[in-house]
């Protein structure tokens, strides 16, 4: 499962990169694109870092970062949609994937926290 999540989190960043190339050449789109590029690509890079964590506490901390970046990505996708910078149909699948990854990461955190608590 770990490898699947690595692939999925990396794919989110790649899909956002493709999406940003479709945005109009407007100042607002440019500013938002910088924000969403950073957080969406950070999902995959921080998940990879979590997989190399030295301890369960380190793993949990890195997963929290993944959760934050995933949530921020979701926020910026909503902004793109609500500001009419991209058609909703174009980001529907991406929003769903980001939400699924967020749910998986939150569930993983809860599992590790229980494991740590029972030690």
Predicted region positions:
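Short, C-terminally biased terminal segments at protein or domain edges
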Residues: 1-119
């Amino acid at each position: 499962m770990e490898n699947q999540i690595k692939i999925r989190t990396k794919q989110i960043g790649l899909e956002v990169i493709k999406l940003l190339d479709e945005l109009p050449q407007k100042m607002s789109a440019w500013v938002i694109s910088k924000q969403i590029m950073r957080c969406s690509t950070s999902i995959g890079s921080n998940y990879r870092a979590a997989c190399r964590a030295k301890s369960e506490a380190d793993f949990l901390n890195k997963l929290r970062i993944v959760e934050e970046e995933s949530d921020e990505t979701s926020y910026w996708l909503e902004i793109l949609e609500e500001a009419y910078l991209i058609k909703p149909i174009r980001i529907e699948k991406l929003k769903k994937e980001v939400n699924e990854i967020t749910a998986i990461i939150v569930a993983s955190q809860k599992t590790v926290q229980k494991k740590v608590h029972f030690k």
